[in-house]
């Protein structure tokens, strides 16, 4: 229910301001957090839950916010491909200074060619874009 409430607020704010370029639903990473160390949280949400958030975001923000980005660093490469097929519009996570998931011990690097291959494997046409979703290069 709180996810729906958040998405409604994002949708209404986007209608008023057109200020968002994309939504990136971030997966909570439990590893190496105080919540894990203090046994306050013992497991992360399931991959199915993460995919539902991506799909729900696509449905609730339709015609308001076109870009639902998939943060492959958080999802892993295979689940990121599934998320692209279930509402995600593009892969993000090529930032050179990624700290959150690196601190949790997750792999955080990939080449542009490897990301392009991931996109091709699911039948999509990869492209490199800028921050404002302008196409810089097609693969």
List the predicted regions and their residue ranges.
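Auxiliary Fe-S-binding modules of radical SAM enzymes
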Residues: 11-139
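Helix-rich catalytic cores of soluble enzyme domains
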Residues: 1-15
């Amino acid at each position: 229910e709180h996810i729906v409430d958040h998405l409604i607020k994002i949708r209404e704010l986007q209608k008023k301001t057109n200020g968002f370029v994309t939504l990136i639903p971030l997966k909570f990473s439990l590893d190496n957090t105080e919540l894990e160390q203090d046994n306050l949280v013992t497991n992360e949400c399931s991959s199915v839950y993460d995919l539902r958030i991506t799909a729900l975001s696509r449905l609730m923000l339709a015609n308001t916010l076109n870009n639902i980005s998939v943060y492959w660093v958080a999802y892993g490469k295979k689940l990121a491909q599934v998320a692209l097929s279930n509402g995600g519009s593009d892969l993000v996570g090529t930032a050179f200074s990624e700290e959150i998931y690196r601190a949790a011990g997750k792999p955080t690097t990939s080449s542009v060619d490897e990301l392009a291959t991931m996109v091709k494997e699911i039948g999509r046409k990869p492209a490199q874009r800028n921050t404002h979703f302008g196409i810089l290069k097609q693969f």
